[in-house]
Amino acid sequence: MSMADQLQIPADIKPRDGRFGCGPSKVRPEQLQALSTTAAPLFGTSHRQAPVKNLVGRLRSGLAELFSLPDGYQVILGNGGATAFWDAAAFGLIDKRSLHLSYGEFSSKFAAAVAKNPFVGDPVVIKSDAGSAPEPQSDPSVDLIAWAHNETSTGVAVPVRRPADSGDALVAIDATSGAGGLPVDIGETDAYYFSPQKNFAGDGGLWLALMSPAALARVESIAASGRWVPDFLSLPIAVENSLKDQTYNTPAIGTLALMAEQVDWMLGNGGLDWAVKRTADSAGRLYSWAEERDYTTPFVADPKLRSQVVGTIDLVDDVDAAAVAKILRANGVVDTEPYRKLGRNQLRVGMFPAVDPDDVSALTQCVDWVVERL
């Protein structure tokens, strides 16, 4: 019998819900219940008809309220997830050249996608080591500036502020794991894009972008230039359909319904301010615990860059983080493993709004209990 099978964490210290993944993340039971009640009649029906279009409209209006969209901004959506949006943006938002801040797996991937696109110039890439981040900056040669609000692989959060002297350059923010859990002024961005499976406790396969009038105008001007783009990645097609409360091709009803329920739940509890306070509460508990123990250290050294939705905690060399995560998993406390490519002796904890801060405290107690017995 393995150590993971032998160690049974006492029930009275375990979290009520043991899901701490950084995406897919915890889905609340009430969301799942809605799939079999209010959303049930929509399954197996046309996405071009009123019932499904009303669901899309409910989601779009909910996001507009949650993020207090400035005048002229629109909620645009399409199938494929944020990964597809990188290519869509390379085709449809970059006129000639872009600048990218690269400080982890996901912030680097948009730059890599742009570098492969034959219609735009080589991107300017400003890099920093994992666990840190470059300062957002402008460059006179670029017409789009991109970075990640929250780098999911490392737990680094970079505030969203339009760089000085950026001129007409669009600001595109990958908010895949930041939207809905971190503070943001959407007016500081032109394309704030994300997916449902992080803060919005849904399934993947969908991208959403909060787009400014300048971004929408860029989409139109690039389309008018005659640049070729696959229809699936066409932002003009996505905009046209989104304004009709639909998607270009068939969406997953469950994904839309789960996310709409989560957005309504956030709004009902106080909106984005409430969600941000909740994730900050969870993060405060995790980082204070990590700083108090002699076997743990927050991976992100600068407290100002530490994410309040994805916490990365290094363990000392003589405590095997993989063994700790394995024992936690055997006890129903799951998805605390680090990002696979980071290669650190580390635990990674998702602290999205669906996660109860008390469960984060319980997780830390479980880690202490396990480490004492290794």
From Swiss-Prot:
Pathway: Amino-acid biosynthesis; L-serine biosynthesis; L-serine from 3-phospho-D-glycerate: step 2/3; Cofactor biosynthesis; pyridoxine 5'-phosphate biosynthesis; pyridoxine 5'-phosphate from D-erythrose 4-phosphate: step 3/5. It catalyses: O-phospho-L-serine + 2-oxoglutarate = 3-phosphooxypyruvate + L-glutamate; 4-(phosphooxy)-L-threonine + 2-oxoglutarate = (R)-3-hydroxy-2-oxo-4-phosphooxybutanoate + L-glutamate. The keyword 4Fe-4S does not apply. It is found in: Cytoplasm. Its cofactor is pyridoxal 5'-phosphate. Keywords: Amino-acid biosynthesis, Aminotransferase, Cytoplasm, Pyridoxal phosphate, Pyridoxine biosynthesis, Serine biosynthesis, Transferase. L-glutamate binds at R48. GO terms for biological process: glycine biosynthetic process, by transamination of glyoxylate; L-serine biosynthetic process; pyridoxine biosynthetic process. Its EC number is 2.6.1.52. GO terms for cellular component: cytoplasm. Its main location: cytoplasm. PANTHER family: ALANINE--GLYOXYLATE AMINOTRANSFERASE (PTHR21152:SF40), AMINOTRANSFERASE CLASS V (PTHR21152). NCBIfam families: serC_3. This is Putative phosphoserine aminotransferase.
